[in-house]
Structures are given as structure tokens and as C-alpha cells.
């Protein structure tokens, strides 16, 4: 099924691209979320009329992402979790924990934009990637510390 993308979508395409995707993905995700329209003649004409507005909005989003990238480049997030004496965590650190830590640091990041390359099950330092935009990914240092028992 051919659709016109109304925004940049990672691993799929950029604003204005006409791509082939599966019908279910189109019906259940892209169209209801306003991320795409069916590639009919009327929708193509309509898209050309609103293309300038969408490109301005996309440029603004890119500018905001670059601003966040410069602030976030040297950020170190410290997460405290229950751990054994050897440093093994009771459980693991997931995207929700990292998102909470980033919010405390002053960054509003969605969980789906956080990429953890490996499972975090021990105390120590880790590098994670945060996708701010389709073209902008920033690497953030995460420090996992054992919670101090009183």
C-alpha cells in the first residue's frame, strides 16, 4: 500500500516520501496517528499545498533537537538502585528508570527514543543512545550506583 509520509519516521522515510508499507501498519498506525496519508491523486495535490507548512514545522523540530543535543552532550545521569555487595542489581535498569533520571536532569525525553544497547544488571558506567530526531542521536553516560543502606 502506497502512502505519503507527513513527517520524518525513523527507519521508514522522510517528509513527503511516497513509500510502500503493509496495509495493517498503514490502517492501524500511520493513518490514525496522522503520520501518513494514502497516496491518491487528491491526497498528492492536497499534500503539495501543505508541504511548506510541514517543512517549517519539521525545521523547528530539528532546531529544537539540535539545541537539546548541545545541552545533553556532556550529561551524566546517576541512577541509584538496590544492589548486592558485589554490585549485581536486584532486577535491571530499563528505559523508564533512565527517563525518570533524565527528567530530573531537566530533559523531557520519550521512552521510545531511549536505546539501551545491552541489559544493565550491574553497577557501573554505561553509554546509552537517545534519538532526538531522525538524524540526531546523542550518547549519554549513565552511572549506576548501589543504594546506600542506612
Swiss-Prot record:
Keywords: Ribonucleoprotein, Ribosomal protein, RNA-binding, rRNA-binding. Pfam families: Ribosomal_L9_C, Ribosomal_L9_N. It comes from Vesicomyosocius okutanii subsp. Calyptogena okutanii (strain HA). SUPFAM superfamilies: L9 N-domain-like, Ribosomal protein L9 C-domain. Binds to the 23S rRNA. One of its GO terms (biological process) is translation. The keyword Ribonucleoprotein applies. It comes from the Bacteria. GO terms for molecular function: rRNA binding; structural constituent of ribosome. The gene is rplI. The keyword Phosphoprotein does not apply. This is Large ribosomal subunit protein bL9. Belongs to the bacterial ribosomal protein bL9 family. One of its GO terms (cellular component) is ribosome.
